[in-house]
C-alpha cells in the first residue's frame, strides 16, 4: 500500500446506464424517466470503478470524499460506487493510483483489473472476499457467465 493509492478487492468497467433495459413495453414511461435520471448520474460503458465491497484507503481520504454525501437509498450507494461523482473518480481526479489485489497478492492497474480474476471473469478463483454478486456469478451456466463478463468487462 502506497500513499495516494487505493487497493480494492474487485472492480468493474460496468455501467448502470448502459445495462438499463426495457423489459416490458407497458413500463416504457418509467424506463425513460429512469434513463433520463441515470444519464445525469452515471457514465456509459466503460465505466471503470472499484467495487465498494472491499477496499483499503486512508480514513482521511475517504472522509474527504464522503464529507458532503449521505446514503439514503440504494441509488445513492450506486452513485458512490459507480456514478459520475464516484469514489473512484474522486480519487483519480486527486491523482490517486487505483489497484485491485487478488488472493495471490498480485496487484493490477486499471487496464488489467479483469486479469485479477476477482469479479465476473473466469471462475473468480482469486477473489479475496465473497458477496452476493460474486456468489451469483458462480451459480451461472457458461452462457450466462459470458453475458455477465461482457457487461462487466466488454469482452469474454
Where in the sequence are the language-model features?
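ER/Golgi luminal nucleotide-sugar-dependent glycosyltransferases, focusing on the catalytic module
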Residues: 1-156
